[in-house]
């Protein structure tokens, strides 16, 4: 009893709409903060305006799609994709991408009153409030945390047609998201009007009535939407009293999913579940006001009322225009339009095209009160019914036959022609290369006027007959790389300057065994074994890591005077001596949790259904009830569950079935339309079937009576051609049928029997009888013949007398009497001269019924009617030449005249000029003759052009509509005479021409080839180039230009074509210059010389100046101190390179100090002769530039303290005191430097290059190069890998073997003939040496040397250690590795002066 009473009370409360006692509307204090003081932006005060596109910092999900921008529209909505300025709300759903969030879609006019504010917010206070609201209204998302909020507020806005005193509304839209879920909150403070006063809205002066405001959401696809109850009805005035979250005037929705989800409060009794009060598909929403259970219905489009029980009268807004009658339907209406109008709302006036059917794709176009068909290409006629014959213009060239198609044509070409108009191809002409003109293996290439021979190496000339002398000295198959110097590229298996040495067995490939597995290294003709670091190491530079200071497996990293330890996991401290405790060793994580240490703490990663610091708290399994339908897979998600739906299904529990179009059932590009439980496919042209799976097949085209048929297929676009039998003709102009996309052939033609009587062949009243391909004439009485052309001949009786001729007539005759006789039978004679029969002044003499004409000179004939000489009267005048022919004449007009009698003047074109000149073409233009009459006389222009030597004369005809022409296929650099004539074409092919407009011009010559820099010094740059004998035949001169620094001046020089190189002198050192070359043709100004396009510019830097006044201020037994002048002001140097050279090796050091003015060379040997060189280095954007080296020659003091001398590049010596030398380190020798041993050896070499980044390229003898990355002092042997291709010039470093000669001090003595060619013998500690005269080198000065330029590699040294075995002890050998810089150097070519066995050597 009590239960029934409770439900009765609930029902009464629900149906009674009771909200008394509940505070209506949301107070402004409860709105999300807004206004300019909060940082809001205000939309312009504009009717139907808005904010414009506002980019979003966070993508906002809406109806399953993410949006990166939105529009705040004044009319109460936020829209995506496009701005919506429509003021009268259209009933949802609507399409055309109108994605809208509508708090109050109505005709707002903020010009009269109110403002519209908006802003994007991410401040913590706003995010915290949004998070709390969503968790309250959607309790199923307790972990939601807002990351972005957008607030739009319409504050005290009025309606269109209102005033500043009209009612105003205040409402707000709040968008909230965390990047995945998105929500909307609507706040309504006061709603006093619902409608604008525009005619389409129908509101009154108080803003009520008509089509009221609409609130809700629209996806923009025409299907998905949601309306707040009362939308577009008068109930919208009470929207601030309704709610779905227990707060009157507030609504909350989740809008990220495919459908809108309504918020709730979860603490009231559900009226919707018990009563289900909403009808006609309306959605019931619990108001859930505490203590006052109620509901509202969200109605489908077309229904309204508290319970959606009222059908909306769509005719109430009078949608039918122009007097149309509205008929109401369910969620629809229809308009019956008056005469002259059409359309869903009678909005369109009828067009004359409505009843006009244009065929073959023609488009109807209304003109005034009539309709005209605009036809597709290929059709004509009033309704585009006639196919245009595109073959009528004979487009096929060179004998091709034309086939007419619809809107097109096809040419069937005759071999060997091809192309759309058979325009491509030519009849085969014998190749000039058939006679094999090229000798000595040359390759023949066809040219425009003959042939060109491409000669092999060693031959030249037109036919490759001339042999090129070869100065290459490379041996064993080596190839010369330099033009004027010997630089050889050796084949595999050979090496040496001239490839004269063959790679033989080396010490390291003779099965040499090294202790402890170390690898073998070539060493001074013998070998050394590289050792491991676990053996006793003795070297002169101890490392901070030698004491193994790092414990517990730590790795020691040595620095210059310190070290650091890299500790393994679990240890720390300077020497890795401290152990870290393992926090996870006690197993703190329970229930299968995983422990992870993080600094001095640990963290447990718990398995599913467990939580807590140690995974000690269990949670229930939310998937145990099997909530996912339709095969969905349940997985746990943020403490709850989520369904992973199979393809096509959606919804929280996979309860929403997929669209029939989900799996794209339509084939071949068909478009699928969703029909609810079924689908429909709209197929592409040419396909059919329920799923567009079948290709349209028109089938076999039917036969046409009295016609033969051919067709090329049965699919869309196929063509069938019909040809009528003799005696029949086509009923239509087209004989082609086309297979149409509908699967049917177009209408067939008919072969209608030809009515041969249609031409009325029967004469004289005869009747025609039609036959098949023939006819027969039934003649009237008195006529006969095939066409009744013959009558009975009354003239057979010869009724005419006195020579009269009889003419037969139907049933009669007539006599044609000779002159002098008249009468029916010509029986009466008359005066023959009475009619003055004699012409051209002839005299008539009567002769008894006849007459005789006595003709004047120049005329003859019975009546003097014939001119004996048609040119007698000079009909052509002085403007042409008369030509008599068959009694008539024709005029051949002189230049400048035309017309039958040469009476019209033919004027030439004017203002002939050259527009553009290229290598193979010239563009010219001109102006037509002055005067309209002169332009109408001519038919076109003749452009004649020929080379100045008279060869290759050509003439092109140009239509009179054009005033320019492009001359093509011209020879480069050649002068051409060009003439343009006005032309009038005549039927006898004797065209009339005007006087010519002429000019002389010359084409551009070909640009230069092989432009390169050959030498650079501090004040000079040398360049060279090449001219091809044939391609540059027209080049007369070469212009070389150099642009000075800072573009201050340009110097140009012209040289003859026989010159192929040039040197610019007097240049500034260390500056950048730009060099360009062009070719010139023509001997002088009168010959119109032309210039080629410039070659690519070369940017070249001159070398810096070498150090000036290089002097050795002090020389001891083991060192030498050098000084030089400070560089001139304005010169910025980067570094210096110091080279120390003996007769055995060269050592280099790179000093990165451009301000250096002195340097001390140490570690020299007592009593030795040295060459010291200092090179200045300047940095540019193209790399480093090196000056010429400044040289200094010294002799160190012996150990006994005696004085030695030094030379400054000459023979002026100074005496200096030396000091004792320190203990000597193993020395490095640079094998391929300027002072290599005089006799090359075949011992294998160990060489390496360093590029400054720790990458080392190493080479062992003839083996390929290898690369490896090393530290400054490797402590273990480094494996070689990563093969790199080396440059052509390889540098070799040899480690000399320590022997007793290095430690014993046995002075050498000089014999009488120790030094040759004037060299001076110098005794030494170990052996004597020779001080050679300039131009000689070698141990005994036996080599005569000269310098030639060559590409080279500069080296900057760096000392590194390398562990090797010496007996049973592992030492560190210190060697130098080098930074590499490519440069232009000088190579020495040396020739032995011995007469017994001459040989060359290149340094």
UniProtKB/Swiss-Prot annotation:
Domain Sushi intervals: 696-753
Positions of disulphide bridges: 272-284, 278-297, 299-308, 315-326, 320-335, 337-346, 353-364, 358-373, 375-384, 391-402, 396-411, 413-422, 433-444, 438-453, 455-464, 472-480, 474-488, 490-499, 545-556, 550-565, 567-576, 584-595, 589-604, 606-615, 623-634, 628-643, 645-654, 661-672, 666-681, 683-692, 698-739, 724-751, 757-768, 762-777, 779-788, 795-806, 800-815, 817-826, 833-844, 838-853, 855-864, 871-882, 876-891, 893-902, 1310-1321, 1315-1330, 1332-1341
Keyword Lipid metabolism: no
Modification after translation (UniProt): Phosphorylated on serine and threonine residues. N-glycosylated.
GO terms (BP aspect): cell-matrix adhesion
Tissues and organs where the protein is expressed, per its UniProt entry: Expressed in lung.
Glycosylation sites: 292, 408, 484, 536, 712, 886, 977, 1015, 1109, 1139, 1298
Residues in NIDO domain copies: 103-258
Compartments where located: Secreted, Extracellular space, Extracellular matrix
KW Secreted (keyword) present: yes
Protein name per Swiss-Prot or TrEMBL: Sushi, nidogen and EGF-like domain-containing protein 1
């Amino acid at each position: 009893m009590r239960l029934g009473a409770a439900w009765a009370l609930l029902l009464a409360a629900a149906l009674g709409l009771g909200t008394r006692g509940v505070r209506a509307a949301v107070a402004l204090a409860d709105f999300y903060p807004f206004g300019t003081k909060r940082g809001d932006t205000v939309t312009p005060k504009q009717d139907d305006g808005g904010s414009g596109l506002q980019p979003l910092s966070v993508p906002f999900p809406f109806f399953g799609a993410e949006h990166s921008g939105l529009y705040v529209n004044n009319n109460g909505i936020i829209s995506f994709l496009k701005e919506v300025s429509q003021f009268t709300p259209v009933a949802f759903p609507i399409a055309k991408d109108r994605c809208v969030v509508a708090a109050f879609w109505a005709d707002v006019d903020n010009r009269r009153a109110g403002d519209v504010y908006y802003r994007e917010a991410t401040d913590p206070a706003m995010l915290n409030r949004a998070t709390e609201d969503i968790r309250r209204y959607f309790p199923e998302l307790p972990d939601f945390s807002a990351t972005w909020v957008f607030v739009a507020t319409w504050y005290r806005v009025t309606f269109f047609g209102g005033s500043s005193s009209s009612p105003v509304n205040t409402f707000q839209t709040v968008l909230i998201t965390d990047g995945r879920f998105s929500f909307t909150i609507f706040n309504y403070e006061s709603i006093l009007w619902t409608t604008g006063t525009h005619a389409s809205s129908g509101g009154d002066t108080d803003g009520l009535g008509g089509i009221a405001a609409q609130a809700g959401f629209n996806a923009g696809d025409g299907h998905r939407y949601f309306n707040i109850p009362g939308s577009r009805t008068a109930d919208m005035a009470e929207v601030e009293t309704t709610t779905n979250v227990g707060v009157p005037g507030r609504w909350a929705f989740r809008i990220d999913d495919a459908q809108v989800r309504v918020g709730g409060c979860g603490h009231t009794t559900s009226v919707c579940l018990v009563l289900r009060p909403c009808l006609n598909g309306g959605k019931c929403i619990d108001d859930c006001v505490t203590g006052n259970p109620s509901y509202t219905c969200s109605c489908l489009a077309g229904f309204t009322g508290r319970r959606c029980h009222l059908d909306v009268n769509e005719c109430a807004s009078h949608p039918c225009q122009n007097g149309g009658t509205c008929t109401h339907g369910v969620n629809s209406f229809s308009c019956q339009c008056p005469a002259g109008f059409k359309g869903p709302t009678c909005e369109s006036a009828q067009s004359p095209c409505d009843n006009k059917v244009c065929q073959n794709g023609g488009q109807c176009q209304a003109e005034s009160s009539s309709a005209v068909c605009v036809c597709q290409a290929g059709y004509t006629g009033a309704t585009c019914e006639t196919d245009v014959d595109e073959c009528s213009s004979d487009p096929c060239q060179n004998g091709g036959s034309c086939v007419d198609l619809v809107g097109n044509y096809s040419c069937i070409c005759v071999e060997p022609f091809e192309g759309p108009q058979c325009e491509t191809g030519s009849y085969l002409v014998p190749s000039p290369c058939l006679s094999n003109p090229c000798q000595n293996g040359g390759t023949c290439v066809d040219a425009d006027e003959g042939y060109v021979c491409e000669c092999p190496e060693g031959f030249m000339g037109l036919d490759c007959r001339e042999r090129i002398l070869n100065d290459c000295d490379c041996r064993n198959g080596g190839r010369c790389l330099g033009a004027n110097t010997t630089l050889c590229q050796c084949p595999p298996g050979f090496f040496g300057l001239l490839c004269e040495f063959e790679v033989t067995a080396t010490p390291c490939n003779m099965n040499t065994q090294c202790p402890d597995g170390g690898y073998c290294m070539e060493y001074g003709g013998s070998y050394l074994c590289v050792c491991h670091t676990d053996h006793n190491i003795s070297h002169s530079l101890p490392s901070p890591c030698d004491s193994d200071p790092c414990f517990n497996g730590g790795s020691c990293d040595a620095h210059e005077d310190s070290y650091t330890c890299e500790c393994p996991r679990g240890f720390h401290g300077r020497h890795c001596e401290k152990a870290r405790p393992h926090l996870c060793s006690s197993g703190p994580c329970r229930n299968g949790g995983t422990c992870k240490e993080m600094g001095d703490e640990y963290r447990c990663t718990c398995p599913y259904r467990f939580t807590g610091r140690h995974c000690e708290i269990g949670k229930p399994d939310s998937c145990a009830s099997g909530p996912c339908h339709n095969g969905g897979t349940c997985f746990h998600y943020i403490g709850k569950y989520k369904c992973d739906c199979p393809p096509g299904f959606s919804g929280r529990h996979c309860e929403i079935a997929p669209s029939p179009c989900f799996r794209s059932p339509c084939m071949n590009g068909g478009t699928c339309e969703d029909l609810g439980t079924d689908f429909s496919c709209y197929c592409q042209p040419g396909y059919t079937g329920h799923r567009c799976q079948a290709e349209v097949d028109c089938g076999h085209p039917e036969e046409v009576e009295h016609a033969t048929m051919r067709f090329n297929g049965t699919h869309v676009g196929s063509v069938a051609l019909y040809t009528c039998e003799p005696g029949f003709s086509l009923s239509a102009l087209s004989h082609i049928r086309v297979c149409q996309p509908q699967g049917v052939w177009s209408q067939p033609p008919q072969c209608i029997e030809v009515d041969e009587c249609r031409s009325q062949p029967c004469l004289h009243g005869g009747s025609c009888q039609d036959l098949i391909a023939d006819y027969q004439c039934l003649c009237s009485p008195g006529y006969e013949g095939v066409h009744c052309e013959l009558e009975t001949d009354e003239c057979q009786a010869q009724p005419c007398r006195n020579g009269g001729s009889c003419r037969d007539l139907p049933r009669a005759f007539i006599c044609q009497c000779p002159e002098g006789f008249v009468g029916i039978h010509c029986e009466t004679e008359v005066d023959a001269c009475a009619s003055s029969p004699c012409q051209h002044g002839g005299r008539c003499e009567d002769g008894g019924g006849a007459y005789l004409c006595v003709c004047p000179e120049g005329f003859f004939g019975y009546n003097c009617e014939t001119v004996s000489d048609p040119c007698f009267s000079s009909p052509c005048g002085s403007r042409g030449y008369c030509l008599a022919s068959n009694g008539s004449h024709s005029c051949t007009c002189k230049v400048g005249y035309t017309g039958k009698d040469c009476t019209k003047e033919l004027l030439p074109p004017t203002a002939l000029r050259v527009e553009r000149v290229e290598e193979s073409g010239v563009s010219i233009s001109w102006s037509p003759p002055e005067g309209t009459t002169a332009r109408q006389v001519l038919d076109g222009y003749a452009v004649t052009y020929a080379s100045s030597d008279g060869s290759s004369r050509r003439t092109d005809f140009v239509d009179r509509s054009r005033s320019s022409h492009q001359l093509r296929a011209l020879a480069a650099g050649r002068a051409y005479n060009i003439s343009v004539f006005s032309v009038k074409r005549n039927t006898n092919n004797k065209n009339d021409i005007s006087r010519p407009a002429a000019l002389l011009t010359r084409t551009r010559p070909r640009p230069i080839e092989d432009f390169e820099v050959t030498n650079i010094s501090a004040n000079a740059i040398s360049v060279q180039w090449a001219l091809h004998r044939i391609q540059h035949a027209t080049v007369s001169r070469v212009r070389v230009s150099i642009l000075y620094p800072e573009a201050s001046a340009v110097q140009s020089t012209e040289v003859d074509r026989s010159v192929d190189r040039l040197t610019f002198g007097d240049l500034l050192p260390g500056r950048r210059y730009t060099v360009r070359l062009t070719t010139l043709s023509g001997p002088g100004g009168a010959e119109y010389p032309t210039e080629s396009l410039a070659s690519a510019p070369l940017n070249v830097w001159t070398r810096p100046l070498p150090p000036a006044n290089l002097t050795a201020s002090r020389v001891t037994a083991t060192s030498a101190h050098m000084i030089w002048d400070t560089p001139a002001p304005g010169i910025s140097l980067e570094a210096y390179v110091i080279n120390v050279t003996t007769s055995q090796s060269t050592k280099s050091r790179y000093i990165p100090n451009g301000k250096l003015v002195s340097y001390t060379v140490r570690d020299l040997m007592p009593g030795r002769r040295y060459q010291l060189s200092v090179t200045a280095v300047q940095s540019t954007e193209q790399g480093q530039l090196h000056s010429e080296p400044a040289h200094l020659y010294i002799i160190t003091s012996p150990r006994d303290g005696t004085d030695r001398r030094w030379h400054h590049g000459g023979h002026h010596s100074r005496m200096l005191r030396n000091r004792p030398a320190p203990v000597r380190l193993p020395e490095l020798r640079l094998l391929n430097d300027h002072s290599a041993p005089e006799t090359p050896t075949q011992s294998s070499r160990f060489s390496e290059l360093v590029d400054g980044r720790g990458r080392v390229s190493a080479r062992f003898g003839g083996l390929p190069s290898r690369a490896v990355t090393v530290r400054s002092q490797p402590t273990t042997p480094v494996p070689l890998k990563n093969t790199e291709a080396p440059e052509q010039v390889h540098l070799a470093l040899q480690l000399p073997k320590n022997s007793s000669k290095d430690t014993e001090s046995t002075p050498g003595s000089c014999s009488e003939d120790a030094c040759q060619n004037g060299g001076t013998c110098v005794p030494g500690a170990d052996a004597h040496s020779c001080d050679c005269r300039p131009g000689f080198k070698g141990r005994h000065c036996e080599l005569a040397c000269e310098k030639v330029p060559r590409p080279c590699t500069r080296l900057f040294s760096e000392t590194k250690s390398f562990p090797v075995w010496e007996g049973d002890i592992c030492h560190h050998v210190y060697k130098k590795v080098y930074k590499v810089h490519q440069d232009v150097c000088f190579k020495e070519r040396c020739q032995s002066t011995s007469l017994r066995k001459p040989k060359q050597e290149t340094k």
